[in-house]
């Protein structure tokens, strides 16, 4: 054992032992309680960031603590390796996405290994490898057979210059991110998965999950179950009688309809624009720009009158039809009723275009005005109908029931339950993804690839150039024969949404070498006992993975319908930001490592200069670590300088896992100093700590009893904190333990050995390298086995008992000191001790005690 703690040497030695022992390989064991903990698999972007370090350390701490408590634990890892960033990097660097991806995986895996993570690498999954995505294709075909997957036209962003489909995030201010061309909306055939078929189950099953309430609410709102009325506005066109159908949750306001708005893609819009160039021009304008719902919500609401009217379903009055850029064909019926008096968006639209505003609900004590929108205008809890004929005076629910009944009687509509959730469009007009296993035959149409021909392998040597899908230009991939008739045919060139890859990888971890998609091992490990990842995945990934599990269950592949029992969404890692702004308002951001900050006498930052030129930079505040703000900390530099254990200790100590973590260089230094103290005590007392003499706890001297009482008391709290995932207070407990052990005067070697061994085991899940090496060097491994599988220390409840207790001494209700009495002292003995105490004499100033109040175990108050 070396005198000086050298993290690089300590960590290399520990990791060497773990590799030699294949320490983290997990096996199924029906006789043991399992614990399966998974961090969301990373995208191989090139390097780990501090968010990764925090996430994986939380997972690792959980794994090690539960393994010490006898659980059969599994912590796997993989790579979410398909996706657009690899294509962008390929275009920038002129290399195939596969090369860029595999190089990044190799480096990031090395970084993870340097962190000492308890990963079972034998279960590693890489989603861009054929042995994985084969099962994406296989399940897609099964879903196609069952009608859970299907084909229909969908709207996409089309770049007319690059001749390619753009993702929503590639559309910036309505233009393509590379070409700058105005983006168009196009309708193309795409494959969808019928997630709406599972909407109610996805909603109802949220109640049984140990997930953060915030995530449940987000999913609940995303699914968006609505109870309303679907009805039609009658009209006649080209000699045909039709209905313009809409859905509303506010049928009680139907008498306030003054216009209808339809989507630019609505069939009625195309018909009405035939001989109206201005209308067609507006439709074309609407078809340019992004198709994301978020974009629609924030953009300027515009519309054009069509000059055509439909009939109000209850009054028969004409209702003008407008085309609105805010109406989505993919939501509802592609048409909405306009009630400006009681819908904020409609109110603004009507004010902009001078449309009538007709009040049809009222709230007692409120006065309606068309001058400005007021929140109560849309209130349905207090509102009653007015200006609505026979419905006047009805509250919301009664009005909806009555109006729905009248619409139904007239054959115009009925009550309906709808969902905000839409079927999942999985087709992506991109190269780097799972090929969709469909062959297009001129004679047979769309033909599924036979199961024996799976996987359809994605060529890995193509380099995208930004102009169209490389697969469509690859004859080797594109050209094939029809499995049905043998004629020349073409492969589907669309690939699957990368959320498909991440929808089930945790099930494959359980059986990575299975010759089927999953096997019995999957039902042993799944569902995950703990899933860990960022709140940004609350909706899409987590919702799709829940859907995928239910589909797999219904196909008889697995026994579970939910992938994760518990979810932890770790907080973001924050850091200071610094910048300079030029005359044009452009900001240049500087990394905190390149800046010197000055502080006031209260430790608050008051100024900063750039180290390279000594000139001032602006303080930008504390924000999430990001490339855009250049305020990240390179984990590798941190590990190289301080060691992985210091990085792990700081990230666990600085904040509870679910809260934001503010980066602190001083905090990292403090973590490093603490580990050096742990090592220094072990080295300085190595001879005493080697003593394995048994002892009778009841016969120990007071110094030994005091130390054991403190250590076992803190151990009890640390164990509780581990169970509730409050790892920051676990570290605090370890610090208290070290302080107590260092400060123990007169403790015997045997008790020092016991208590220091408790400290090492409490710290081990957080800092496994240094504790593993100290455990071995000081002979604990010879007694208990390697720290990897050493049992969690048991609290000695007898050690917590005290012969004496300390009570707060008060005089006239004010704290004046402390009083030590026997634990079983009678009330009379406590009263006598209180009036005999010197502090009572000092503050009573000769006055006798009138009354003595004793609160057992807590305080004694003498009233004079």
UniProtKB/Swiss-Prot annotation:
Q: Which GO terms describe its molecular function?
A: aminoacyl-tRNA deacylase activity; ATP binding; leucine-tRNA ligase activity
| Location (main, coarse) | cytoplasm
Placement of sequence motif 'KMSKS' region: 624-628
Q: Which residues bind ATP?
A: 627
| Any matching Pfam family | tRNA-synt_1
Query: What keywords were assigned to this record?
Result: Aminoacyl-tRNA synthetase, ATP-binding, Cytoplasm, Ligase, Nucleotide-binding, Protein biosynthesis
Gene Ontology terms describing biological process: leucyl-tRNA aminoacylation
Where is this gene product found?
Cytoplasm
What catalytic activity is recorded?
tRNA(Leu) + L-leucine + ATP = L-leucyl-tRNA(Leu) + AMP + diphosphate
Keyword Isomerase on entry: no
Q: What class of enzyme is it?
A: ligase
Provide the E.C. number(s) assigned to this enzyme.
6.1.1.4
Motif 'HIGH' region: positions = 42-52
Known InterPro entries for this protein? aa-tRNA-synth_I_CS, aa-tRNA-synth_Ia, Leu-tRNA-ligase, Leu_tRNA-synth_edit, M/V/L/I-tRNA-synth_anticd-bd, Methionyl/Leucyl_tRNA_Synth, Rossmann-like_a/b/a_fold, tRNAsynth_Ia_anticodon-bd
Report the GO terms under cellular component.
cytosol
What Gene3D superfamilies does the entry give? 2.20.28.290, 3.10.20.590, HUPs (3.40.50.620), Isoleucyl-tRNA Synthetase, Domain 1 (1.10.730.10), Valyl/Leucyl/Isoleucyl-tRNA synthetase, editing domain (3.90.740.10)
Q: Which domain of life is it from?
A: Bacteria
**UniProt keyword annotation of Ligase present:** yes
**Which family does this protein fall into?**
Belongs to the class-I aminoacyl-tRNA synthetase family.
Q: What name goes with this protein? A: Leucine--tRNA ligase
